[in-house]
Regions:
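Short amphipathic alpha-helical "recognition" segments used for binding
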Residues: 6-7, 32, 117
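Bacterial Sec-dependent N-terminal signal peptides
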Residues: 1-21
Length: 174
């Protein structure tokens, strides 16, 4: 009987630890206005504004605790619809000043969204997983969704490609 109780205690302890998982979702900003190549801080174009609204649908069932964005028009405009929908303030971060261990510590047990750039998001993921897996995103690709899950010492990661053209075509059939 004592062995049975011990096994139950172990099983419930493992289950409780699983509740402290951190989920970090990372996306690149949506399509930017490329009409002025000298503009270092462009706004989103029409397609980008549409994509920003589609991200709201993608994250409909995710209850974020925090939302992070770089301090650029295109990243803030990408995440603003999600921020408004979830009623969560956007926190500004600098990708060149990230301490990944500190970030993981401050977001422990939370669901977090991070929005950045083609040359920062893959490296942010690599920093979180402490492994060089992901490369810079192609400049015309605004469709990657990375997810990092940290449960105690177990880290899993994945990359999804959200093809809006296929998604829009599918919706038109409904």
């Amino acid at each position: 009987m004592k062995q049975f109780l011990f096994i139950l205690l172990i099983l419930f302890s493992v289950d409780l630890e699983g509740q402290d998982c951190t989920e970090i979702y990372l996306i690149r900003h949506a399509e930017k206005d490329r009409s002025d190549l000298k503009n270092k801080n462009p706004h989103l174009n029409k397609l980008g504004k549409d994509r920003a609204l589609k991200w709201v649908e993608v994250f409909k069932n995710v209850q974020f605790d925090k939302i992070f964005s770089t301090n650029y028009n295109r990243t803030i405009e990408t995440v603003k619809p999600i921020s408004l929908d979830k009623k969560i303030e956007i926190s500004i971060y600098s990708p060149s000043k990230i301490d990944y261990e500190n970030f993981k510590s401050k977001t422990y047990g939370e669901k977090v969204l991070v929005v950045g750039h083609s040359n920062t998001i893959p490296f942010f993921v690599n920093g979180l997983i402490d492994n060089e897996v992901y490369q810079q995103i192609d400049d015309l690709n605004n469709a990657n969704l990375y997810k990092v899950t940290i449960c105690n010492d177990n880290i899993t990661h994945s990359l999804l490609y959200i093809n809006w053209k296929v998604f829009r075509n599918f919706l038109s059939l409904l």
